[in-house]
A protein has these predicted regions:
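Non-catalytic recognition/regulatory regions in large multidomain proteins
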Residues: 1-424
Length: 424
């Protein structure tokens, strides 16, 4: 059997970041995008929380990476040497964070020097989106730039005669980047200083001033992530700008409506496998999905007016702000499923009638066939037999677990300054 491998060409870091998110998603059974709606989910997440990704962890990495690279600037070196120097310092950073009093979210805490993808790669695109990274290319291109000429903060661009080119100054990193704390990276912590928090807040609000993320780091206030499980549950959502509230409403509606499609898909798969062989595990799964669908339908009915009046033209316009290339088949699938939900709401039907509708069954089977081809479980007994029993059955949260950590890190950085002032 041929071994499948991935080889990275010189992608933009955004493309690479997206690909790694896809790989991670397919490694996590509960978040697998079985119905091909991930492009819509990610588009909405980019609108709400620009610069973030599911493979990020803590806000301080938006400072750690520039600090490491700024410390390397001002020297002439090969791309390989720069990459190795940066790698060593990132390993030092891992060790320092692992020894700190807050190890949650330390990237590479287990792998250490054997880590395959370092934080500099994970955060590179987000650093550009927030305007912290001014260098316009990929991380590899940045490494190569060291070989052509010593790069450094405030480097003056020159013309072919070696003279200043119109007084242009090239900044690879934002000139207001705070200095690292003493001993970095051998000593490091996720705890932000007030100046760190202020810088990150300013970068978010300047680079994405109309985003919900900008509102959260500015006026959102401290909240409990244990009780705020989705972005629209934030206690200050009602105080957000009208644009953000509209975006959140679209995200909430999409999450609610499409959750039913995912649950229905899982139930139909379990029943298809039970038709081939009876197992206690699958019978328990079937009962679980039936219960989850009942709960979902009760919630949908509670939101009947919202679901029936949901403006899909406005929804797609919002999603297109994050991704203008959402496939027409994805649009068709979403709108057809929504039409079935609305039809059954109008008729006052129980959820079982929706699930047993042949049109619904055909829609889900055809969607899986479009996405998986010969590997579609509805048509491939071997694939069905190897299924783990749960695929993409969770509600869409638009990276909220990661985003909430980043937001709270920044807000707690301001609180740290207030505490120091009060006790000083």
């Amino acid at each position: 059997m041929l071994k499948s491998t991935l080889s990275w060409v010189d992608f933009s870091e955004h493309d690479r970041d997206h690909m790694l998110q896809v790989i991670r998603i397919f490694a996590e059974p509960e978040t697998v995008d079985e119905l091909g709606i991930g492009s819509v989910r990610d588009a909405l997440a980019d609108v709400l929380f620009p610069g973030t990704s599911t493979i990020q962890t803590r806000a301080a990495y938006f400072l750690f990476i520039p600090w490491i690279y700024v410390s390397l600037e001002g020297r002439r070196a090969s791309a390989r040497d720069v990459a190795e120097l940066a790698r060593r310092r990132e390993v030092q950073l891992i060790d320092a964070l692992a020894a700190s009093d807050d190890t949650r979210g330390v990237i590479g805490i287990e792998a250490r020097s054997k880590l395959k993808r370092f934080p500099s790669s994970i955060y590179w695109n987000g650093l550009g989106v927030w305007g912290i990274r001014r260098f316009p290319g990929s991380r590899e291109q940045y490494h190569r730039s060291f070989a052509s000429s010593p790069v450094g903060p405030g480097t003056v661009l020159t013309n072919d005669d070696g003279e200043p080119a119109d007084g242009v100054v090239r900044w690879n990193w934002h000139p207001a980047l705070p200095d690292p704390p003493p001993g970095f990276p051998r000593r490091a912590s996720f705890r932000l200083r007030p100046d760190d928090a202020d810088f990150l807040q300013e970068r978010i609000q300047s680079s994405a001033p109309n985003s919900y993320l900008a509102f959260l780091v500015g006026e959102g206030g401290i909240f409990s992530p244990e009780t705020v499980l989705f972005p629209w549950q934030h206690p200050r959502t009602a105080h957000a700008p009208e644009l953000n509230r509209r975006q959140l409403a679209h995200a909430r509606n999409f999450s609610l409506v499409m959750h039913g499609a995912a649950l229905c898909y899982n139930l139909l798969l379990v029943e298809a496998r039970l038709a081939l062989r009876q197992t206690d595990a699958d019978e328990e799964r079937r009962d679980t999905y039936v219960d989850m669908l009942e709960q979902w339908w009760a919630e949908v009915k509670a939101w009947t007016r919202v679901v029936q009046q949901w403006d899909m033209t406005s929804f797609w316009a919002t999603a297109e702000q994050g991704n203008p290339n959402i496939h027409r088949r994805t649009r068709y699938f979403v709108e057809t499923w929504l039409a079935f939900v609305r039809e059954h709401l109008r008729g006052g039907h129980p959820v079982d009638r929706l699930v047993r509708s042949q049109r619904v069954v055909d829609l889900l089977k055809e969607r899986e066939r479009q996405l998986k081809g010969s590997r579609a479980r509805f048509y491939n007994p071997h694939a069905l037999d190897g299924w783990n029993g749960r695929s993409g059955a969770d509600r869409l949260n638009y990276r909220w677990p990661v985003v909430s950590d980043i937001v709270l890190d920044i807000l707690n950085g301001f609180a740290e300054g207030e505490f120091d002032a009060a006790t000083g």
